[in-house]
A protein has these predicted regions:
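Conserved catalytic neighborhood of penicillin-recognizing serine enzymes
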Residues: 97-135
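Active-site SXXK
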Residues: 62-92, 125, 265
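Soluble periplasmic/extracytoplasmic beta-strand elements of cell-envelope proteins
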Residues: 42-46, 54, 70, 91, ...
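Acidic helix-start/capping segments at beta-turn-to-alpha-helix junctions
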Residues: 86-105, 141-142, 209
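Bacterial Sec-dependent N-terminal signal peptides
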Residues: 1-25
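Beta-lactamase-like hydrolase cores
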Residues: 19-62, 239
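Mid-domain, small-residue-enriched loop/turn segments at the edges of structured enzyme/sensor domains
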Residues: 40, 135-197
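Structured C-terminal helix/loop/strand segments within mature extracytoplasmic catalytic/sensor domains
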Residues: 23-33, 139-140, 144, 191-219, ...
């Protein structure tokens, strides 16, 4: 047998072993970061669409506003089925701009009685995590049931979207009803990047909106500042529950490196007893470790 052919066959045989060892090393590093933290922390990383690393994935994590990404996909599907573009105008009454919730949309248009496009509303939800814009989109596109049903149609199962932002605001315990495992959310992002879910104009709009996200700069994006990496992400932030714990501090996104490597990363932190700053720092530390590992170790 030709020596080069033999070496090639041997390489194919040992490559899975090398890959397993490398991903095991990353998992150990991530476990080291979260050890001793006063919170339930779940992590999922998908490298180049293939190798997967998870930590504490078998738990229901409240998504908080990360579910607005799920909603955006369902809105795109709704628009395609109805023959609507994201330029389609939506009339918004003053009563829909609730005063007791986070809403840059309401702050800009406090009197309501305005018309904005579906795309503008999606920018408010994906860029700024606007709660009123989210519930307006739910109202116009079939509610949480439609979003839940659409995501399930993609083959995603370990999640649930049952309540609106207004319902969560009225009952903090309802936040736990919109949940997901980290890996299921990572799979959704992978689908957005690699599959033709709907028309390219819808798909590009959502990925571009994730890249220009303005929230959570102290989380996944923080250690990537000053690098040439491109990150798109969606954050989620909860209030404190009756025990004084932060219900959810989350970030879910994708990173494209200059060397052509790509990875999806999701970090969900549930019931944190740490400070808000320290909880966000955990996500940043995880992001830094994954970035360093993939950009330098996997050559």
């Amino acid at each position: 047998m030709n020596i080069n052919k033999l070496l090639f066959i041997l390489w194919l045989l040992i490559l899975p072993v090398i890959t397993l060892a490398e991903t095991s090393s990353l998992k150990e590093q991530l476990q080291g970061i979260i050890g001793g933290k006063k919170a339930q922390i779940g992590i999922a990383v998908i490298i180049n669409g293939k190798d997967t690393v998870t930590v504490n994935n078998d738990c229901r994590y409240p998504m908080m506003s990360v579910f607005k990404l799920h909603q955006a996909l369902a809105v795109a599907d709704y628009c395609q089925r109805k023959g609507l573009s994201f330029d389609t105008s939506v009339h918004i009454d003053r009563a829909e701009l609730k005063t007791d919730t986070y809403s840059p949309l309401r702050d800009k248009y406090p009197q309501g009685n305005i018309a904005l496009s579906i795309g503008e509303l999606l920018k408010y939800t994906l860029h700024l995590s606007d709660n009123n814009a989210c519930d307006i989109l739910f109202d116009r596109t079939g509610g949480t049931e439609t979003t839940d049903k659409y995501i399930r149609s993609l083959g995603i199962g370990h999640f649930s979207i049952e309540v609106t932002e207004d319902e969560m605001h009225k009952d903090l315990n309802a936040c736990y009803r919109n949940w997901s495992t980290p890996l299921e959310t990572a799979k959704i992002i992978e689908m957005l990047l690699t599959q033709e879910l709907f028309g390219k104009e819808y798909q590009n709009f959502i990925t571009d909106a994730m890249i220009t996200c303005q929230t959570g700069k102290d989380r996944l994006a923080y250690p990537l500042e000053g690098t040439n990496a491109i990150i798109g992400h969606k954050t989620g932030t909860g209030d404190r529950n009756s025990k004084g714990q932060i219900i959810g501090t989350n970030d879910a996104g994708f990173v494209c490196l200059p060397n052509g490597k790509r990875y999806t990363i999701v970090v969900f932190i549930k019931d944190s007893e740490e400070t808000e700053q320290a909880t966000s720092r955990i996500i940043a530390d995880i992001s830094e470790t994954v970035y360093r590992y993939i950009s330098t170790s996997l050559q």
